[in-house]
Amino acid sequence: MPFIDRFRALTRAQRNTFAACFLGWTLDAFDFFLLTFCLTAIAVCFHTSRKQIEEAIFWTLAMRPVGAFLFGSMAEKYGRRPTLIVNVVAFSVFELASAFAPTLHSFLICRALFGVAMGGVWGVGAALALETLPPANRGFFSGLLQEGYVVGNLMAALLFAVLFPHLHGAGMFANWRVLFMIGALPALLGFYLNYKVEESPAWLAGRNAGAAKPARVSTDWRVIRGYLPIFLFVILLMTAFTSFSHGTQDLYPTFLQHDLHQSASHTGLIAAVGNIGALAGGVCCGALSERFGRKRTIVFAALLAIPMVPLWAWSHTAVALAAGGFLMQFMVQGAWGVIPAHLNELSPAPVRAVLPGFAYQLGNLLSSRNQIFQQTYADHYNAGSLKVALSATVVIVAAVVAAVTALGPEARGANLS
């Protein structure tokens, strides 16, 4: 079915729901990736090393499981829609607070709180979208939904490339602070969610049947323990997947600027081209997973990332690096594009808003030192150059993603109602 026809087949309510969930994940990622582009500028502002500022990435990732469990539990109890509204407003507020942080310590606290808010968006939004959309095109919309993360990265890259070189303010109006102020604008999405989006029909059906009884958070944890094998498998899978994405994204702008001496504009544009590849990969592989299966598509995309390493990390011209970035992110996010559908199909209905998001963010926690390990390895063995560390990350993690996926279960086409 052609791209446009898939959207035409949706009802107005389904289109509004998908748009809201996609935008929520997009703007969440936009706020997160602004930090990765501004690491050097923030280090200069706080008179510290870039490695110290990279701790902000760690604390953001480390606190995401807290948000996933907190907001996921709220979504099971109060509904997906109102929880997502609170979630979007919360991460926007903490992004704005980061812009006005006067010290490194307060900045790290703001990023940790941002991580709590960020942690809830994926699980709640994916549950709301995939419970609302028709099962026949679930793989396609899964790929498109997941690539909201990539679109957010693309927006951050373009904003950095276009605006950052022209910002020359100081103090509370330093260049990176202005970008973080812009990052607070996603709060406006809350109004759209409030007026245009309907609650998940699956959640409403459960409530009307008496299944959505008021529950304490501890009750949700007891329910999750009842599905411990699948929960542990998803944590392992998401640890590999988050190492795959963050290992190829978080320090890549720094690598381009510090190691290859690319300008801020070139860095932003190379990252933007990579994100266009990621968007294409996520949508294509998500759709292909309907035909070839979730597992097979993930394994294929992950392993094809390995041959892309030479062009991606060992080129020297901006054009070659952009081509490498496009191909690398096509494969990385191609594998990721299958994940929302894959995890929601594997997750039992009573914990669908909690389990995928919570396991995903626990995977983020377990891989949250990834960029620290990459930088430490580079400092100790390669005089600070990230080239070898980034290359090794892709080869090792791509193989692990393929192996774990191949050994796990699949539930393509499962009923989510």
List each language-model region with its residue ranges.
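Cytosolic juxtamembrane N-terminal segment immediately preceding the first transmembrane helix
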Residues: 1-30
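Extracytoplasmic gate region of multi-pass secondary transporters
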Residues: 36, 227-279, 367-371
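Extracellular/periplasmic helix-loop-helix junction of adjacent transmembrane segments
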Residues: 36-66, 265
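Helix-breaking motifs and short loop linkers at transmembrane-helix boundaries and internal kinks
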Residues: 47, 79, 100-106, 134, ...
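Central cavity-lining transmembrane alpha-helices of secondary-active solute carriers
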Residues: 58-72, 272-284
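Conserved MFS/SLC helix-loop-helix module at the cytosolic interface between two early adjacent transmembrane helices
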Residues: 66-102, 292
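Glycine-rich segments within core transmembrane alpha-helices of 12-TM secondary carriers
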Residues: 139-164, 186, 357-371
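C-terminal transmembrane helical hairpin of 12-TM major facilitator-type secondary transporters
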Residues: 289, 295-339
